[in-house]
UniProtKB/Swiss-Prot annotation:
Keywords: Amino-acid biosynthesis, Asparagine biosynthesis, ATP-binding, Cytoplasm, Ligase, Nucleotide-binding. This is Aspartate--ammonia ligase. It comes from Streptococcus pyogenes serotype M49 (strain NZ131). It comes from the Bacteria. The gene is asnA. One of its GO terms (cellular component) is cytosol. The lineage of its organism: Bacteria, Bacillati, Bacillota, Bacilli, Lactobacillales.
């Protein structure tokens, strides 16, 4: 039992370390330290889809402030790039750990504990467009494939990912599968191509509903791009043969500029956020134009090691029935 546990931990470390090294080299970012707490009221917390309640923390020696455990570092990263004067084409990556206790499903792929490679880069002049987003997606997908090949060589786990990732807009997807739910659309398109970047998540589609929810103040999901489609963000999805479904590895996008921020908070009714320090800084032109995202660490390990449950590669909390159903939960 001990031997199996140690081997399991060595596999997890190998995937994480290998991916980290490739990501830093190929994406050309520096690894930095990030926070676990965010001060309430400065606007730095990631509100995700807007319905999740963060974990509140009171610090004894700072009685005049309340803090929250971060959901992600989407806004903190952009603030940090500005604070330390990162130039065009430069960026950072953080080994982020977060808690999302309002996760509506604790299942094979969802956990209260979230670990990500959280990255952000300053966009070069004239590159705030769909083509640059696709370049970044292809770079990250290359890192995923290189890591998969390294796992194949070390552990004899057959590589399954296609050489190229397929791009498709959410508007195209709803037209292609009008009678399917968003999740069913993801399953259909990802099973067909093996690896997909789904562009434009957050805005209302022709069927009157968004593909999925997104906060209005980090990703730009409203800017018109090509053929009347909208959105400069999206998700990297791969086909998970173990689960028989699409499997999200990363959410990423070009971040809002001043106009996109104002447009999106008006659409979601979140204009009150513009009073926060972070949002004021953006509106006053103090932040660079950036692109960034989060890549799930435990999800990546789970996929590349062909595990059935995310609890096999991370230590978290689970209902007893989940522990009873899976022998290898950590």
């Amino acid at each position: 039992m001990k031997k199996s546990f140690i081997h399991q931990q060595e596999e997890i470390s190998f995937v994480k370390n290998t991916f980290t090294q490739y990501l830093i080299a190929k994406l050309d970012v520096v690894e930095v330290q990030g926070p676990i707490l965010s001060r309430v009221g400065d606007g730095m917390q990631d509100n995700l889809s807007g319905t999740e309640n963060p974990v509140s923390v009171n610090v004894l020696k700072i009685p005049n402030a309340t803090f929250e455990v971060v959901h992600s570092l989407a806004k903190w990263k952009r603030h940090t790039l500005a604070r330390f004067g990162f130039n065009e084409g430069e960026g950072l990556v953080v080994n982020m750990k977060a808690l999302r206790p309002d996760e509506d499903s604790l299942d094979q792929t969802h956990s209260v504990y979230v670990d990500q490679w959280d990255w952000e880069k300053v966009i070069p002049d004239g590159k705030r467009n769909l083509a640059y987003l696709k370049e970044a997606v292809e770079t990250i997908y290359k890192v995923i494939r290189l890591t998969e090949l390294a796992v194949e060589a070390r552990y004899d786990i057959e590589a399954v990912l296609p050489k190229k990732i397929t791009f498709i807009h959410t508007e195209e997807l709803v037209a292609k599968y009008p009678d399917l739910t968003p999740k069913e659309r993801e399953n259909a398109i990802t099973k067909e191509f093996g690896a997909v970047f789904l562009i434009g998540i957050g805005g209302v589609l022709p069927d009157g509903k968004p593909h999925d929810g997104r906060a209005p103040d980090y990703d730009d999901w409203t800017t018109e791009t090509e053929n009347g489609y909208h959105g400069l963000n999206g998700d990297i999805l791969v086909w998970n043969g173990q689960l028989g479904s699409a499997f999200e590895l990363s959410s990423m996008g070009i971040r809002v500029d001043e106009e996109a921020l104002k447009r999106q908070v008006e659409m979601t009714g979140d204009q009150d956020r513009l009073a926060f320090d972070w949002h004021k800084s953006l509106l006053n032109g103090l932040f660079p134009l950036t692109i960034g995202g989060g890549i799930g660490q435990s999800r990546m390990v789970m996929f590349l090691l062909r595990k059935q449950h995310i609890g096999e590669v991370q230590t978290s909390v689970w209902p007893q029935e989940v522990r009873d159903s899976y022998d290898n939960i950590l």
